[in-house]
Regions:
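Basic/polar N-terminal segments that are highly enriched at the extreme N-terminus
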Residues: 1-3
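N-terminal amphipathic/basic leader segments beginning at the initiator methionine
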Residues: 5-7
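N-terminal small-domain helix-loop-helix segment of the aminotransferase-like
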Residues: 9-94, 101
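Short, hydrophobic alpha-helical packing/hinge segments within bilobed ligand-binding/sensory domains
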Residues: 98-99, 123
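PLP-dependent aminotransferase-like
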Residues: 104-139
């Protein structure tokens, strides 16, 4: 068997998953753990996704994101007062992937990352997998 990355041996089960499991087992408990919407995806979004599939948009997008999406994000950022070119935009599936990708790109083994706490529990996992050490900063 191929040995796992030694950083993985330092990981603990995510506290948010522990609390989510507990909430699911507790009758009448309101779950405020994962930040997941309590409604289905709106119909216009589902229709747009279906239309895209019907038009053959079934392949991987470019690594940085589609040119159209990157241009739209750049325009939105520019309107917010942050002049941005599409070439400066990298699209990810969410904030966690963005943080993970950024830290893998800049963090060297053993470097410390200061994180204001309380914080989302996945941050420590991301830092650990990237080879760093989380330093909590009470705020």
């Amino acid at each position: 068997m191929i040995p796992l990355n030694s950083n993985l041996t330092q990981l603990k089960r995510s506290a948010i998953r522990v609390y989510t499991d507990l909430a699911r087992r507790t009758p009448g408990c309101v779950m405020l753990t994962l930040g997941e919407p309590d409604f289905d995806t709106p119909a216009p979004i589902r229709r747009a996704a279906w239309d895209a599939l019907e038009q053959g948009q079934t392949h991987y997008a470019p690594n940085q994101g589609t040119a159209e999406l990157r241009a739209a994000i750049a325009r939105a950022e520019t309107r917010r007062g942050n002049p941005t070119a599409p070439e400066q935009v990298l699209v990810t599936v969410g904030a966690s992937q963005a943080l993970f990708t950024a830290l893998l790109g800049i963090l060297n083994p053993g470097e410390e990352v200061i994180v204001p706490v309380p914080a989302f529990s996945l941050y420590e996992t991301i830092i650990t997998i990237a080879g760093g050490k989380m330093v909590p900063l009470d705020v």
